[in-house]
Amino acid sequence: MLRVMMLGLRGFPGVGVEAHAEHLCELLRELDCDVEVVVRSAYVPGDRGNDWKGVHYLRIWSPGSRALETIVHSFLGVLAAAWRRPDVLHVQAIGPALMVPLARALGLRVVVTHHGADYEREKWGRFAKAMLRIGEAWGMRFCNRRIVISRTIRNLVRNKYGLESNVIPNGVDLPELPTSTSALERFGLTPGRYVLTVSRMVPEKRHKDLLAAYATAKLNGWKLVLIGAIDRPDAYTSEVVALARATPGAVLAGFQTGLSLRELYAHAGLFVLPSSHEGLPIALLEALSYGLPVLASDIPAHLEIGLDEKHYFALGDVQALATRLELFARMRLSQAQRESTRRWVADRYEWHTVVEQTVRVYRSAMEQSASRRRLLDRFLSPLSW
């Protein structure tokens, strides 16, 4: 059995990196992996238990400061990994990768997944961005094996560091389409008559662009539903909440999971992701897995998914987005068209393929480590002189 420890996560369930790791960990168990996830105790209270779908939790404290949370938690997580000695320490994202040199110095085999250039996110200040750049450099240079979730990130790593990576994208499952509408009734929604976006409430998700475009567009009774957690209230979240409350038809649905989230996806008329920065957006893949028509900003991460040109609009162009909203609101997809979309995304981003490729990277990291150890033993052996 392969023992894997996962580092760099707040906990499950979640969005973004957490959603990626949540699916990955669950399926790793099916390939005979024993998975332990280092989580932040503030996000996973003890009353949730120590296991999640067969995945073990290791709760470790982290400070409340946004600037220090990841660094301190990752440092403590590496020390815990050094004590527990997993076969592979899998570090998720470039922030926690700041601790990769320490992990290697402590004799751990390390795989790093690069989910995107987080130093380009608008929410971070100068110091945090500097730490993220160092985390990227140290993580890529000192790990045993590196995974990137898109060709765009592979090219970034290749051009900046002269290093090759394993491209393993985010995956997506084909969900069963619920017919129930309890969540819609709770928010006063009509099936097929609302625009949906799902993301954390942070500046690079560009909620204000979407709200402005929705207010401009003539959508004849459609509503706009914003799903996503507010990690920490700040000036941006206050602006978005105030703007949403001042926009007739806008609905702040907060964090959703389980059946409620599935219902809100399944019955949406259109999904929109206007982000200025993404790695490979799971929320967009999930929208496609429900067969939804989608609109996305024309950033490289979205373009790489390979949708038809009509599904993209220029980043930050509110009027262009409003025009597309009106156009797509008039479209009606048949059930056959929705099923075609579902099959298309499932063929390209199948989760079991993602997990099998990840396990191969783990075993490659272990073989590399064993090979280096044999070389060192041969060099140090008196018989070799």
What are these regions (language model features)?
Residues M5, G188-T216, V225:
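Conserved donor-binding/catalytic core segment of Leloir-type glycosyltransferases
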Residues P293-A296:
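Short hydrophobic beta-strand element within catalytic cores of glycosyltransferases
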Residues F255-Q256, E263-A268:
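Short alpha-helical donor nucleotide-sugar binding micro-motif in glycosyltransferases
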